[in-house]
Structure formats: C-alpha cells, structure tokens
Amino acid sequence: MFAVGIATLGAEIAAARLMAPFFGDSTIVWANTIAVVLVALSVGYWFGGRMADRHPTLPALCGTVLAASVLMALVPFVSDPFLSLSLDAFDTYSVGGFAGSLFGVLALVALPVLMLGTVSPWAIRLKMHAIEDSGETAGRMYAISTVGSLLGTFAASLLLIPLVGTQRTFLTFALITALVAALGLRMRWVLVPVAIAALLAAPVGLVKASDKGEVIHEADTEYQYARVVELPDGERHLELNEGLAVHSVYRPDTVLTGGVWDGYLIEPFSVLDAPPERIAILGNGAGTTARAYAEYFPDTLIDGVEIDGELHDI
C-alpha cells in the first residue's frame, strides 16, 4: 500500500503537468485532475472491495497492480497524439479548456488510478485475520498508504518532474509499483518492471510539436512547462505551458522585437529627460527587455527578477 500510495498521488501531480502544454495549469485544469483522481479512487475502492471477497489471494492483487503499472507506463507515450487530437477537436467545437482537460485526464489516468484504488480494501482483506483487530488493521494500512501519498506528492513536484521530466516521472512511479507487484507473482513477471526500466533509459521524445516552427528546447521546470520555438526566419519565441502567449523573443540580428517589449525602451521618457540610471524588471523571462536596454542604454543598471530560474538559463 505504501508503493501504491506513492504512485497514486505522484501520478496525479504528473497528470496535471501533462495537461499544461495543451490546456495550461489553471485552477480549472487542477480541479479536473483532482476530481478525476478522486472519482477513480472511489470506484476503485468499491470494485476492490468486491474483488477482495471474490479473489482473496495475493497473486490476484499483485496482478491487478502490475496491470495498472503497465497502463501508467503507457500514459506519457500516448498523451501527445491523443491530447493534440483532443485539443484540435475541442477547439473546432468551441468546448473550451474545462471539457478538454477533463476528457484528457479521464482518458489517460482514470483507469490506472482506478486499478490502484482497488488495493486498499483488497490489502486490508488479506491482512485481516481476526475481527477483534480489524479496526487497527484498517487504520494501520490507510496510514501507510497516506504516508506513501505524501511522499509521492513531494517526490513528483520537487524532485522528479524538475530533474527528469514528466515522461520519466510516470515511468518511475510505474516501475515502483511494478517491482512491488512482481514480488508476489511468478518469476516470469519480472520482465514487466525490466521493460519499464528499459523505457526509463530511452531518449525522451518531444512533449508537444509546434505548428509555427521547430521546437529547439523543452524543459519541465519547477513551475511550468517551457519551450523555445525557432521560426523559419531564425526568430525564437519562449512559450510557457499551453503556448497561447509569447513570453520572450530573440532575433539574431537585432534586439528590437516589433512587439510589446520595444515599448519598455521609451516608457521611462514619459517622466524622465534622460535614460534611467537603474531599472528593475519583474518577470524577466528569457531577458528580452534586459537585452534591449543593455544595447541602447549601456550605462543603465538592470535588475532582472524571475521566479523561475530555468527561464533565465534558457
């Protein structure tokens, strides 16, 4: 139950990040993700209780967990084409991000989470030997599962996603549950966690293609999904999450962008007669405005503040 707790909440965090390049990371997307996980767990608890009475054996439980691990490992590989098609379809019918993200989470993570949800009542049924200590047994098992969920939440958000990305985060949680499940099955089922481990070593594919140009860099930062798109003329755009807005622009032959960033060069002169001695940029992004100021006003001291340090590195 500890391993399943880790994987369940870890998958929830990773699922929300999986939605970000397509539907953003708004409260609506998070609400849909949490709601789908809770519904899937509820159905899993109910179904797991029935399965526990019909098949009160460890191999049956481990087989279910192993199947859930396989489904979880497949999620990042089917998400890009599926979510891209879903986004195009929902844009065509003007349904919006709420229905789009809800459908995406339902289709991708509901089934593996439901199957993991069967573990709690099933494991309690196997662990319970006497009615006298049934309450203590159930309480201990749920406590173990909850501690695992806490660990999975923090591991996904603070460690795995920033360090290895969303795809390998799903694979890591799938590997954890597959290893635990394989211990209760015959030796040949060890091939499943071995296969998942092999996928972990495989190169990470493109998270989301662009119809404007070539994606030359992608990153899952602590705060968001970021990518750099290079247009046919060499201009580069920094896009975050769903990419509806351009957050920074780079042109190889000029610091001017032809966009809103150029306005910051002249705005100080509405109240000053000379270039400012010092400016502060809150939300520096990839440094578009700072680069322009350094070119046109080299004597101006620039303080660029960006909460997401990886954008500065980009």
Q: What residues fall within each predicted segment?
A:
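Conserved SAM-binding loop and adjacent beta-strand
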Residues: 249-264
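Alpha-helical transmembrane segments of multi-pass membrane proteins
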Residues: 1-219, 227-233, 242-246, 258, ...
